[in-house]
């Protein structure tokens, strides 16, 4: 039986990804691999991660670190001290890998499931319409929601500046605003602080591998989880 395997934020942790796939006995001929975004950055092997995911025919959605990489390639972003993307940008197959990465959408759907990197605004009634057809190279407020959302108010307004926790009243974790609102289960990542999220209609998979936590998978068909510990902490909080 085909399994849909959703993977939390990998962020260049290729070794942990390979170990998790071994634990899952992943078979690319029958299983569908769907990362939640942030394929790259902060971890030790972003280049190897992209090559592996591409070779396995992975799907997935774009995250904020993926957008940062694409913008850096266009010369629109400067590298930050914590970035680990130089190896990707210097690779002979960089353009091929980034073309593959750029083709990831901001939302994917299956019957009963939404996949998005960060979250969905509580103001949205049709997330697919809000996020379909957006160009990752053109700034759009809905892209910020899909790739950066953590806290918001009940109208979906994000705090400015984006502090964690935010200053000011009315802000709550976005998923508390939308819990039970959609008939679909929302699979997401991006925010390691809450850890594994398993609530009604919510599966949050960012368990902080790059920070020394774990890399986590959710198997949709039987609603089970699998994870492996990080070999070490790759990036400071």
PLM region spans:
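N-terminal active-site segment of His-dependent metallophosphoesterases
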Residues: 1-52, 56
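Active-site environment of divalent metal-dependent phosphoester hydrolases
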Residues: 11-15, 41-43, 67-70, 108, ...
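Active-site neighborhood of divalent metal-dependent phosphoester bond hydrolases
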Residues: 46-154
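Divalent metal-coordination and catalytic microenvironments
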Residues: 9, 38, 53, 63-64, ...
């Amino acid at each position: 039986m085909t399994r849909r395997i959703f993977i939390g934020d990998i962020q260049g942790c290729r070794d942990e990804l390979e170990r998790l796939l071994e634990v899952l006995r992943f078979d690319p001929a029958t299983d569908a691999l769907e990362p939640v975004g942030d394929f790259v950055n902060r971890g030790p092997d972003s280049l190897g991660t992209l090559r592996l995911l591409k070779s396995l025919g992975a799907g997935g959605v774009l995250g904020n670190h993926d957008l940062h990489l694409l913008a850096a390639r266009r010369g629109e972003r400067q590298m930050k001290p914590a970035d680990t993307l130089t190896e990707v940008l210097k690779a002979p197959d960089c353009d091929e890998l980034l073309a593959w990465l750029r083709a990831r959408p901001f939302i994917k759907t299956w019957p009963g499931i939404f996949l998005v990197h960060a979250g969905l605004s509580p103001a949205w009634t049709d997330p697919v319409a809000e996020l379909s057809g957006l160009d990752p190279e053109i700034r759009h407020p809905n892209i910020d929601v899909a790739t950066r959302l953590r806290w918001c108010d009940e109208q979906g307004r994000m705090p400015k500046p984006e502090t964690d926790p935010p200053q000011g009243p009315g802000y709550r974790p976005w998923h508390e605003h939308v819990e039970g609102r959609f008939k679909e289960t929302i699979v997401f990542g991006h925010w390691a602080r809450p850890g594994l999220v398993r609530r009604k209609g919510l599966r949050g998979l960012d368990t902080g591998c790059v920070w020394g936590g774990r890399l986590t998978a959710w198997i949709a068909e039987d609603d089970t989880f699998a994870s492996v510990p990080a070999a070490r902490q790759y990036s400071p909080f």
